[in-house]
Structures are given as structure tokens and as C-alpha cells.
Regions:
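Short Pro/Gly-enriched beta-strand edge/turn motifs at strand-loop
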Residues: 45-55, 125-129, 264-269
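Short, contiguous pre-domain boundary segments
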Residues: 6, 11-26
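Rieske [2Fe-2S] iron-sulfur-binding domain
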Residues: 55-159, 163-173
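Non-catalytic accessory segments flanking enzyme active sites
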Residues: 24, 28-67
Length: 369
């Protein structure tokens, strides 16, 4: 195991050699100080994927998301420009909008009825004409950086951040190659869970298929593990494997070059292009604290009227596949606090980078360090 400092810093070359690597120490998954450090270092300075563009496609459409305690509202203006703001009134700090839906042409604070245009500028503050030196320019909503990229919506709390493409170079082209219809996807189902697991625990689980055989029999019946690869691309990775039809999970015509594409995006989003044409699933992680993560598991199809097979597949995800992963990460989170856990685990990365190799975890842990 590595020599580790008693605080929450790791050697810069941590996990640099996947074939001789150990996991991040358990305390990084369970300690509030570690989480506070990550909130500022990672989440306040990274592009976070929050939704597919179809959720806010029309003027006045809005959604809200909560990330590291910050509530963000994303709204498309009457000028068709999509913007993000901290969801807080600059007057006394009250939240402006909740949930999602169709905003009126002005956003009105429910506390004192200050009203804001959809571009964030102040429309009206009651009695402001009688307040000395009232400056409407200092009473606007505070913007959050936003980009639409590869069909999805990304936000960044760092106003000086470079582009999404700078963080995830080449990702957009690869996603479009895997799913040419990505811009036409429509949300068909969402499973939201407040998962009792650290966000890194959930990412670890996604970044290896070592567990697929024992824990996901339906998925493993479709994926061809001997034709499965995991490649690293800086702050994103790609798991790619050929698929075969299965009565337990994915049903499609045999003889096609059907494949799985599993994209992990720094820090904690997962895009899954399935063997079913015109289908994609996305796992959005929104960390709450060191041992809790809000997850949206979204299923998308290009068609609005679902077929019976699509409905059955949604049920399989809801009742079988999704619970399998939730049970795993919840159990691991408990085990990381056990006296019987030695504090770090050996990363099972083999020399060939096979379909069951855990080199993806080593890559992720090196980025976290």
C-alpha cells in the first residue's frame, strides 16, 4: 500500500501504475472533511452534466438541480438562449423556483415579489423607486456557466472555466458516432434514488465489469466479455463491447454488429448507448454529503410512443438491473467502515486490459488524487 499523509491529500502519482495499484483509502469515502475538500476542488470547478437538452428545448422551459448544496435553475429564455443561475433571490436569499416546468415570462420571488426576466435581469422590485441609491444592476440573478454539448446540458460554477470540450476532448465526436440520434432523444423514464453511498463508490462500480458476471446475470447474458474493452481518454473513458440478444435483457436481431458503449464523464456522469437502436441511458450523480448521493437514472428513446418491448426493457431496468447496482454500492459503503476492511483494496488490473480488468478504477483514482 502507498504511504499516505494523515490529512486528505494523496501522492500526485497515486495509482499511476494500474498493475500495482491500491484503491483510495476508505476514509476518503466516509469523512466529511474529505467531501468538503472535493466540493471545492472538484465540483465547484468542473463541468457537470445535469440533463438532456430535450428537457429545456422550448422557450420558458426550466429545470432545477442541486449540486453540493447549491440549487441551480436552468431556463430557456424567450430569445431561445439557455441560461443557468443560482436559484436564489439577491434581495434576501429566498429560493425562486422549484422542480421543473414552464416559467412565466418573469420569475417572481415568492417572498417579496421581486421579479426577474429570464435573462436574469431585474424586472421589478416593489418600492425600489423610494429606496435611496437602489441599483438594479446589482440586483440581477447570479449566472452559472452553461454549455450545450453532445445533446446534453452542462454547468460549471467556476465563471473562468474553459469549455466542456477542453475538459472532455473528443467526447462529443465519439458520442455522436455511437448514437447519431443523440439530439433527438426524449426522456422515457427516470428513476430517482437518494443512495446511501459516496459518489466515488458509485463511479468505482461503473468503471469495471469485473462484477458483471456475478452481479448482473441479465446484462452478462448479452455482453460478450471476451470482446469487451475499456479505454482511457483523460477525463472520460469508454467501455465498449459487442452484444448478443438475450431473453433476459436486450432483444434485437441476431447477426448485427450491436454493441454497448459506456462513457464515464469526469467527475460523475455515465452515458450508456445500448444495443437497441435509438436508445440511451444516463446516470446523473448529484453528491449530497460524504455518504449520500442523489441519482437520476434516465432512460431515453428517440420515439415518443413506446413499444411493448421498450416498456418491458424499462421495467427490467427498474426492477432488475438498477436494484442490482444499488445493492452493491450500499453494501460497499457499509463495508468501508468495517474494522474488518484493511483501509485499501487491491485494484485488479490485468496486463492485457481485459474485459474484467479494473484499470478504469486506477485511472479514476489517479484523477481524484
Amino acid at each position: 500500500m502507498s504511504n499516505l499523509s494523515p490529512d486528505f491529500t494523496l501522492p500526485i502519482n497515486f495509482c499511476a501504475n494500474p498493475q500495482d495499484a491500491w484503491t483510495i483509502p476508505a476514509r476518503f469515502y466516509t469523512d466529511s472533511q474529505a467531501f468538503e475538500h472535493e466540493k471545492e476542488r472538484i465540483f465547484a470547478n468542473s463541468w457537470i452534466c445535469v440533463a438532456h437538452g430535450s428537457e429545456v428545448a422550448r422557450p420558458n422551459d426550466y429545470i432545477t438541480r442541486e449540486i453540493i448544496g447549491e440549487n441551480i435553475v436552468i431556463v430557456r429564455g424567450r430569445d431561445n438562449i439557455l441560461r443557468a443561475f443560482y436559484n436564489v433571490c439577491p434581495h434576501r436569499g429566498h429560493q425562486l423556483l422549484s422542480g421543473e416546468g414552464k416559467a412565466k415570462n418573469v420569475i417572481t420571488c415568492p417572498y417579496h415579489a421581486w421579479a426577474f426576466k429570464l435573462d436574469g435581469n431585474l424586472a421589478h422590485a416593489r418600492n425600489c423607486e423610494n429606496v435611496a441609491n437602489f441599483d438594479s444592476e446589482k440586483a440581477t440573478l447570479v449566472p452559472v456557466r452553461l454549455e450545450e454539448y453532445a445533446g446534453f446540458v452542462f454547468i460549471n460554477m467556476n465563471p473562468e472555466a474553459e469549455s466542456v470540450e477542453t475538459q472532455l476532448p473528443g467526447l462529443q465526436d465519439k458520442v455522436l458516432e455511437a448514437c447519431p440520434d443523440v439530439h433527438d432523444l426524449k426522456l422515457a423514464a427516470r428513476f430517482t434514488t437518494l443512495t446511501p453511498a459516496n459518489w466515488k463508490n458509485i463511479v468505482d462500480n461503473y468503471l469495471e465489469c469485473y462484477h458483471c458476471g456475478p452481479a448482473h446475470p441479465g446484462f452478462s447474458d448479452s455482453v460478450q466479455v471476451d470482446r469487451y474493452w475499456h479505454t482511457m481518454h483523460g477525463k472520460w473513458t469508454l467501455q465498449y463491447g459487442f452484444a448478443k440478444p438475450s431473453e433476459q435483457s436486450f432483444k434485437f436481431e441476431e447477426g448485427t454488429d450491436a454493441a454497448f458503449h459506456g462513457f464515464w464523464l469526469w467527475p460523475c456522469t455515465m452515458f450508456n448507448v445500448t444495443p437497441i437502436k435509438g436508445m440511451m441511458t444516463v446516470i446523473y450523480e448529484f453528491p449530497v454529503d460524504e455518504e449520500t448521493t442523489l441519482q437520476n437514472y434516465d432512460i431515453y428513446f428517440t420515439n415518443e410512443e413506446l413499444t411493448d418491448d421498450q416498456k418491458a426493457l424499462i421495467e427490467w431496468y427498474r426492477d432488475v438491473f438498477r436494484p442490482e447496482d444499488l445493492r452493491l454500492v450500499e453494501s460497499v459503503q457499509k463495508g468501508l467502515k468495517s474494522r474488518g476492511y484493511r483501509g485499501q483494496g487491491r485494484i485488479m488490473a490485468d496486463n492485457s486490459g481485459s474485459g474484467i480488468s479494473e484499470h478504469g478504477i486506477a485511472h479514476f483514482h489517479n484523477l481524484v488524487a
